[in-house]
Amino acid sequence: MRILLIHSDYIEYEVKDKAIKNPEPISEEEKKGRMDEVLVAFISVEKVDETNPEEVVSKAVEEIINVASQVKAENVFVYPFAHLSSELAKPSVAQEILRKVYEGLKEKGYNVGKAPFGYYKAFKISCKGHPLAELSRTIIPEGAKEEEVPEALKKEETELVSYWYILTPEGELIEVDKFDFTGYENLRKFANYEISKSRIAEKEPPHVKLMLEHELVDYEPGSDPGNLRYYPKGRLIKSLLEQYVTEKVIEYGAMEVETPVMYDFEHPALEKYLNRFPARQYIVLSGDKKYFLRFAACFGQFLISKDAVISYRHLPLRMYELTRYSFRREKRGELSGLRRLRAFTMPDMHTLAKDLEQAKDEFKKQFKLSMEVLKGVGLTPEDYEVAIRFTEDFWKENRDFIVELVKIIGKPVLIEMWKQRFFYFILKFEFNFVDNLDKAAALSTVQIDVENAERFGIKYYDENGEEKYPLILHCSPSGAIERVMYAILEKQAKLMQEGKKPMLPLWLSPIQVRVIPVSEEYLDYALYIAGKLEGARIRVDVDDEDERLNKKIRRAEKEWIPYIVVVGAKEKESGTITVRRREDGKQYETRLEELIKEIKEKVEGFPYKPRPLPLLLSKRPKFRG
């Protein structure tokens, strides 16, 4: 059973139509309903619940009561909700289990309401928005077969106790429920998301519509969910991002390597690490041996480091790989467009440091590197929220260092503190993007790892020739490339909601300039202009469709083309061009050389790739119907 619990000002519903052949019989009165000051329990009954319905009912009632007591709710509303799971129980079983949950809560003295089972319903809900307002629970009957899950993930889901704070640039550590979030709305949303740990995607985020409309990325029905296909424009954007991040990391001082995508389950060091890393794996059989698909570049880089001869003079030693792909078998209900995938591209750098002071110095440098990388893709600190995670002991011993990081970002950050260390790292930060559905996704991240050097036998020789274990920093300065695309598109979706013009960064725009002849008579001149732009390494195309000028301009606007160049008799005779600049809406006349200079200045320092589609619009296929 999956339960999503939302503490609400109210919920109201209205039955619209039957969703199954034999829905629960209801009266006219039951076709509508409302309850105020309520804990709403959205429930999916799963196939595995059929093995022991009574136990599932008992545990569900217990979990709901526990949350109701925490949020001080006397009213509870049971809402059948099939969208939390892809493995649903039979309708007859689900209906009976939900009825018993309803009765069990009533017997415990709660005022209980319920929505009817088996119908399409419209509903309105007003979530209270405090840190405990959104929580999720999973109930599995005893003896039910569970998927193989690493010990670290089990601990994270069952044993981990977190203490949440907000840390200000002034060094003030404030309990999260006592912090005044006025002026920090996104931080409030991020804190709620992190504390509730609800990762279920209830509806489609706006970036999905954009990635489909612009023919960038699409779902691939012929593959496992969470594996995507990229059309030419999307592949260009992804490729440029991959090149950009790789160049930044190599410029920082990393050595690029390449390692396998699968590893032996029985390798002693890998087996131990698997149980310390909170992720689900894909499993591959080769003969009678079992392998797992990598979920990061750690394994390959650690095995290279184990075999290398390393001196203290080589430290900090930085190694990097862009993994295309890494794999994590995320839960089906958590998959969401480009935000959460099962196959993804991860820029992954590991740094060996001789001691904690050197590790902290690298940590701070990589914090700044991550800010710089995100700035290049159009994301500033206003666009993301920071989480820093550590143990209570680390905080006491390194308080000034943590506060220094917060001063660098220049705004309050979320702190997750543990009484004891659950994972292989002692310190971690992430830059998290909060999207239009108030879901958060980690982009940049760095961790200081204190376990894996010894686990993998990675050593260096110190000044006295003695072997020592280094500390290891795990760094992704951008996060998964797909997540960067998600954040860019979600940011544009937000601008659209505010009535502003969306636009990709110029260096990432698949087409940077569109040349539009006012009629077929000026097509040759348009092609001449396009040739000059292409010769200057600017991505350009020509709209040669037999349509009115206004329609062509509207199409270019709809495609977010940064520069629209219109050419006709006047431009041909004068040797000038008429330009519409999307960034500020300005329309002006200029010489072609000036436009080239303007664009080249704006994209300086960023990678370039040629146009991903044919020059003429009339020669292009349509990838989506």
Swiss-Prot record:
Catalytic activity: tRNA(Thr) + L-threonine + ATP = L-threonyl-tRNA(Thr) + AMP + diphosphate + H(+)
Cell location: Cytoplasm
Sequence segments annotated as region (Catalytic): 206-505
This protein's record includes keyword Iron: no
Chief localisation class: cytoplasm
Keywords, in A-Z order: Aminoacyl-tRNA synthetase, ATP-binding, Cytoplasm, Ligase, Metal-binding, Nucleotide-binding, Protein biosynthesis, RNA-binding, tRNA-binding, Zinc
Binding site for Zn(2+): 298, 350, 474
Region of interest called Editing domain, as start-end residue ranges on this chain: 1-143
Cofactor(s) required for function per UniProt: Zn(2+)
GO terms assigned for molecular function: ATP binding; threonine-tRNA ligase activity; tRNA binding; zinc ion binding
Broad EC category: ligase
Cofactor note: Binds 1 zinc ion per subunit.
Domain of life the protein comes from: Archaea
Gene Ontology terms: cellular component: cytoplasm
GO BP, one annotated term: threonyl-tRNA aminoacylation
The EC number(s) this enzyme carries: 6.1.1.3
Subunit structure: Homodimer.
PANTHER family the record matches: THREONINE--TRNA LIGASE, CHLOROPLASTIC_MITOCHONDRIAL 2, THREONINE-TRNA LIGASE
Role according to the record: Catalyzes the attachment of threonine to tRNA(Thr) in a two-step reaction: L-threonine is first activated by ATP to form Thr-AMP and then transferred to the acceptor end of tRNA(Thr). Also edits incorrectly charged L-seryl-tRNA(Thr).
Family: Belongs to the class-II aminoacyl-tRNA synthetase family.
UniProt note: domains: The N-terminal domain is an archaea-specific tRNA-editing domain that hydrolyzes incorrectly charged L-seryl-tRNA(Thr). Catalysis of tRNA editing is performed by the charged tRNA itself.
The protein, known as: Threonine--tRNA ligase
Organism of provenance: Pyrococcus horikoshii (strain ATCC 700860 / DSM 12428 / JCM 9974 / NBRC 100139 / OT-3)
